[in-house]
Amino acid sequence: MMKKTILVTGGAGFIGSHVVRLFVEKYPDYHIVNLDKLTYAGNLNNLKDVEDKSNYEFVKADIVDSEAMLKLFQERRFDGVIHLAAESHVDRSISNPTEFVFTNVIGTVNLLNAAREIWKDNFEGKLFYHISTDEVYGSLGEEGLFTETTGYDPHSP
């Protein structure tokens, strides 16, 4: 029996696939559900090495679909969420900001609402991690680095 069921959104993306692989391999008694819309940034080939693991499951879905998200949460009863699904390419944010708002804002709200709905009677032990992008810090010069205390300085929608 699996100890916990964890949802990873955007799990077929660059960072998400690394997170999925880490959890599948490090926590064999956890059920890892990878939810991805498989847009230009998602690629299931990133996860060929874990696709047949018994504790791994892929779900193709869009976090903007609030009904689908609530149904998925009700069926799987997630113990935790690692939310990486996002539109993050700056050039695309300039040419189509509406798509970014739907995915990054509405999609995140849909996940939070679904989590709240199934966790409302007992939040104990439940975790929701929202992963952002380094783009919120703006541009980095030739030297230096961003830290936990770096202020936000976004330059794109």
How should these model regions be labeled?
Residues 1-157:
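N-terminal Rossmann-like NAD(P)+-binding domain of SDR-like oxidoreductases, especially those catalyzing
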